[in-house]
Amino acid sequence: MKVIGLTGGIATGVTTVAQMFRDMGAIVVEADQIAREVVEPGTGAYQKIVGAFGKKVVGRDGTLDRKVLGEIVFNDTVARRRLNAITHQEIRQHILAEIERLRATNPDAVVIVDIPLLLDTTGPEAFNLEGVIVVVARREQQIERLKARDGLSPDAIEQRLDAQRPVTEKEAEADWVIDNSGSLEETRRQVELLWQELLMQ
């Protein structure tokens, strides 16, 4: 089984690329989905987050209000580190358990582990990855996509972009780079070529 990390900057198109790999036959493990599961009401991480940030981060339905929590942590490096300290170890353990489950049930699979902050936090060695794909896009495209997708103000967009390492730094650490600055078809062609390379290794 091959286990490859997939990452990039916010709004570079990592989710789009992950779906393309899925369409080609990869098994995709999504850190964002696992991150949502580990902070569901009743979990230890949920209790710690509410304890650290207060009831204001709890929505009407009792789940975490991700928008409110995001506004807090994107404005405050100390708060962001506190949140990461609560969640990252839990997320890592769940991802590793899922990889081991897949190794037992799908030994011939190519597994793409979509971890948005892979190169911002732990690094590929924490997940025993055999390589890292970084999805890149121009900063102005990231800004336009964030505006369209999340309806964020210019200040909020800059805060989110500045909270992550620059995409150029991540690109330097990549084993493979997918440039998502062009059309979807251009991106798909790059993914197809890389998929064939992964299958042949």
Task: Mark where each language-model region is.
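ATP-dependent small-molecule kinase phosphotransfer cores
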Residues: 33-110
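Small-molecule kinase domains that catalyze NTP-dependent phosphoryl transfer to phosphate-bearing small molecules
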Residues: 97, 124-126, 148-197, 201
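Well-ordered beta-strand positions
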Residues: 27, 131, 175-176
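An amphipathic alpha-helix signature
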Residues: 46-50, 139-147, 154, 158
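N-terminal polybasic phosphate/anion-binding patch
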Residues: 18, 28-40, 55, 148, ...
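Residue-level signal for inorganic ion chemistry
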Residues: 13, 32, 83, 112, ...
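Walker A (P-loop) phosphate-binding motif
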Residues: 1-33
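ATP-dependent NMP and nucleoside kinases share a basic, alpha-helical "lid"
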Residues: 96-105, 110-148
